[in-house]
A protein has these predicted regions:
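Short, solvent-exposed polar/charged micro-motifs at secondary-structure junctions
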Residues: 9-12, 114-116
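Glycine-rich beta-alpha junction loops
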Residues: 2-7
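Conserved N-terminal alpha-helix of the aminotransferase class I/II PLP-enzyme fold
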Residues: 10-62, 89-94
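Conserved PLP-enzyme active-site core in the AAT-like
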Residues: 54-177
Length: 177
């Protein structure tokens, strides 16, 4: 629902002023910015994932886009697991190039190649565990060690793992999808 009903223009303006001062404070004036339902969902997911905060997006592609674009700028590089979710590959192989952001893919069973792929421009290692297309499991502990050693941020798509089986934030990942 994108329309939120108010009794008067005065009420809308009050709510909008509060939302500007505190964007996550539960002041709803338009559904795209969140509703009581989305904020409750975010609070529940934050507890399930045992994380600091959760943002919901309308699609998985939106979540991947947000995770990557929040830490990269033109000229940066990311490294992604080869068997990523096909829309993630679409994003990395097509859209990131438009922004001069390079993606290198690594074999999830060859972490030496992953480490050799890291450059001074590498900002993110993007992991899926298990991999969407192949269900490959990776040594995420080793990946985290490599990332920390090189001071590279990490993101993991945990769609298949869910917080029931895996809690990536507790393990040390910087971002969870």
């Amino acid at each position: 629902a994108s329309t939120i009903i108010f009794k008067s223009m005065k009420d809308i303006r009050k709510t909008q002023a509060k939302a500007i001062k505190n964007p996550t404070g539960g002041h709803y004036d338009y559904g795209r910015q969140g509703t009581s339902t989305t904020y409750i969902l975010q609070k529940i997911l934050t507890k399930l994932e045992e994380s600091y905060h959760v943002f919901t997006t309308p699609t998985g592609f939106g979540a991947v886009f947000l995770a990557i674009f929040s830490v990269t700028r033109p000229g940066d590089e990311i490294i992604a697991a080869d068997p990523v979710y096909s829309p993630t590959r679409l994003l990395t192989e097509n859209f990131l190039k438009e922004f001069n952001i390079k993606t290198t893919f690594y074999n999830p069973h060859d972490l030496k190649t992953l480490e050799k792929s890291i450059t001074k421009k590498t900002k993110l290692i993007f992991v899926e565990n298990p991999g969407s297309n192949s269900f490959d499991f990776q040594d995420i502990g080793k990946i985290l060690s490599i990332a920390k050693k090189h001071k590279v941020l990490t993101a993991i798509d945990n769609t298949w793992g869910t917080p029931y089986f895996l809690k990536p934030i507790k393990l040390g990942f910087d971002c969870l999808l």
